């Protein structure tokens, strides 16, 4: 059962859930908290690798990822990031989120943006219990026109679901937590699997 707006506010007030900066009450509705787009992005360099063998030797996977991922792009205030049709890019939420060991989060895109072809997550929309950091968005433009994305715009909504009890291995305590405390648009670390 997901937390309703009243319970989200209570969890925030009690410090059981942290969203920084704390969203105003106007952005907490029904079962969701609206989140905004941050100013950090990464793109994929075109045709710098013939392919990436995801199950190949880790050093080869790592080298291929280094070839295809751009350095982090940090936009200045007022700048826009242009996502062209058929392109995939990474970005982050403006807000940082910290979940306790007994709560899982879910990121959903906005219907108004989806109707223009923008997907804010390709498959990874679960936020594990114990997570702390900015949420990476996996943008894909399935539309016909380039989309201008500006830091600060409403980009998605988070919902939260209590677990039956605290997880024994929450994300922030796992030794293999590849994205712990991420602050930017961190590229895939599949080579760390």
Curated annotation (Swiss-Prot):
Gene3D superfamilies: 2.70.40.10. Its EC number is 3.5.4.13. GO terms for molecular function: dCTP deaminase activity; nucleotide binding. Pfam families: DCD. CDD domains: trimeric_dUTPase. Residues 170-181 have a biased composition (Basic and acidic residues). It is an enzyme of class 3 (hydrolase). The active site is at residue 138. Keywords: Hydrolase, Nucleotide metabolism, Nucleotide-binding. It catalyses: dCTP + H2O + H(+) = dUTP + NH4(+). Pathway: Pyrimidine metabolism; dUMP biosynthesis; dUMP from dCTP (dUTP route): step 1/2. InterPro entries: dCTP_deaminase, dUTPase-like_sf, dUTPase_trimeric. GO terms for biological process: dUMP biosynthetic process; dUTP biosynthetic process; nucleobase-containing small molecule interconversion. DCTP binds at residues 110-115, 128, 136-138, 171, 178, 182. Catalyzes the deamination of dCTP to dUTP. HAMAP family: dCTP_deaminase. Homotrimer. Belongs to the dCTP deaminase family. This is dCTP deaminase. The lineage of its organism: Bacteria, Pseudomonadati, Pseudomonadota, Gammaproteobacteria, Enterobacterales. The gene is dcd.
């Amino acid at each position: 059962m997901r937390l309703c707006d009243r319970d989200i506010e209570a969890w925030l007030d009690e410090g059981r859930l942290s969203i920084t900066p704390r969203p105003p009450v106007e952005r907490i509705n029904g079962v969701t908290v609206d989140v905004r787009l941050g100013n950090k992005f990464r793109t994929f360099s075109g045709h710098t690798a013939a392919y990436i063998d995801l199950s190949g030797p880790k050093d080869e996977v790592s080298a291929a990822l280094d070839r295809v991922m751009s350095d982090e792009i940090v936009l200045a205030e007022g700048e826009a990031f242009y996502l062209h049709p058929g392109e995939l890019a990474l970005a982050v939420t403006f807000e940082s989120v910290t979940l306790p060991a007994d709560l899982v989060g879910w990121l959903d895109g906005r219907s108004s943006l989806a109707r223009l072809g923008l997907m804010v997550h390709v498959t990874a929309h679960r936020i594990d219990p114990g997570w702390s950091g900015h949420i990476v968005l996996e943008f894909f433009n399935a539309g016909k026109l380039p989309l201008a994305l500006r830091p600060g715009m409403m980009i998605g909504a988070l919902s939260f679901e209590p677990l039956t009890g605290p997880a024994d291995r929450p994300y922030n305590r796992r030794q293999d937590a590849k994205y712990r405390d991420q602050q930017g648009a961190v590229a895939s670390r599949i080579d760390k699997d």
